[in-house]
Amino acid sequence: MLDIQLLRSNTAAVAERLAARGYEFDAARFNALEEQRKAVQVKTEELQASRNSISKQIGALKGQGKHEEAQAAMDQVAQIKTDLEQAAADLDAVQKELDAWLLSIPNLPHESVPAGKDETENVEVRKVGTPREFDFEIKDHVDLGEPLGLDFEGGAKLSGARFTVMRGQIARLHRALAQFMLDTHTLQHGYTEHYTPYIVDDTTLQGTGQLPKFAEDLFHVTRGGDETKTTQYLIPTAEVTLTNTVADSIIPSEQLPLKLTAHSPCFRSEAGSYGKDTRGLIRQHQFDKVEMVQIVHPEKSYETLEEMVGHAENILKALELPYRVITLCTGDMGFGAAKTYDLEVWVPAQNTYREISSCSNCEDFQARRMKARFKDENGKNRLVHTLNGSGLAVGRTLVAVLENHQNADGSINIPAALQPYMGGVAKLEVK
């Protein structure tokens, strides 16, 4: 959520920065609500002053035996009390409208973010690794994976489209990838592993920015036997739960940075994705991801963003996968991000790079929604900065390993770094 004081003092500048990311800020509406709020506040202050003044007179009037005048003054105070209650209700209504609107406004792009309308104007930062040249006709991950235990038909039978069953060697490889990622982040990069709920309340999703704007992208659930029919949600990413562990808290500055990681399933309705990536694992309703989150001092957040990109890159390098890093332009960034880098892995069968990680600095946007603060060296409470990144999406990493390390006979070479997690197995072969 944006700083309301920044909006009040720099409305035009904020509107211009939001326009760069394709959001039209209604300055006239904001100014009208602000005028309404100010008018109610002025009226409230005048009523309070009048009440206090008249209340002081009542005792004096009674002492002078002026009982009728004292009663009239008491009647005035009673009316003022009613007027104050109405003013409080009016102010609350205006404030609620402002707050609800603020929750729907995206973050401001950082000054270093390239301007652009959509993904076609993202900027490549670097490429690492050279895509392999095959001397045989390659297969995609579907044709490679099905003989090894990848079962799309079984997933569809159980749950519908965009669900998958894995068994045998593929299931083991999928598990090994997640364990390798977790071990790398905890043992080499200094993150603390977490296990968090997969079902959350709306306030939790509001804290990280998925609600209220993106409700259609979420899976909604209700408890059996719950007469209130309270809606909860399956998490779209462990970013939600990891980041919210610091909601409504004040962290001593010496404890920063907090580095959190978790392996979890992610559930997404993929609203608006009809017809996209219908074949294979690239776009699923349920997929696993190892998430990285850091809670940091505001002055350290952009340094931390570069560090987190490096942590995700280390996984790709260890798995011997070609990839590139791109900076998202203003028109392609996520709702809560001030700056985002995407890591895209080479997918041979598609002859292109596909997103496998997204690392974002949200600055204080989420922290303001969550009331996540730290106590600085002067004893003042300030908002932390929050960052998140995929480290990595497990299913897409599986796709990349299958396709980049395939052999002509359909077998798959296991990268050396992954072999200890596969019980020493160096190759997947159709049995």
Curated annotation (Swiss-Prot):
Keyword flag Ligase:
yes
* A Pfam family assignment: tRNA-synt_2b
Source superkingdom = Bacteria
Q: What InterPro entries does this protein map onto?
A: aa-tRNA-synt_IIb, aa-tRNA-synth_II, aa-tRNA-synth_II/BPL/LPL, Ser-tRNA-ligase_type_1, Ser-tRNA-synth_1_N, SerRS_1_N_sf, SerRS_core, tRNA-bd_arm
Organism taxonomic ancestry = Bacteria, Pseudomonadati, Pseudomonadota, Betaproteobacteria, Neisseriales
Quickly give the catalysed reaction: tRNA(Ser) + L-serine + ATP = L-seryl-tRNA(Ser) + AMP + diphosphate + H(+); tRNA(Sec) + L-serine + ATP = L-seryl-tRNA(Sec) + AMP + diphosphate + H(+)
Which species? Neisseria meningitidis serogroup C (strain 053442)
Per the record, the gene is: serS
Instruction: Kindly tell me the pathway this chain contributes to.
Output: Aminoacyl-tRNA biosynthesis; selenocysteinyl-tRNA(Sec) biosynthesis; L-seryl-tRNA(Sec) from L-serine and tRNA(Sec): step 1/1
Major subcellular site: cytoplasm
Q: What is this protein called?
A: Serine--tRNA ligase
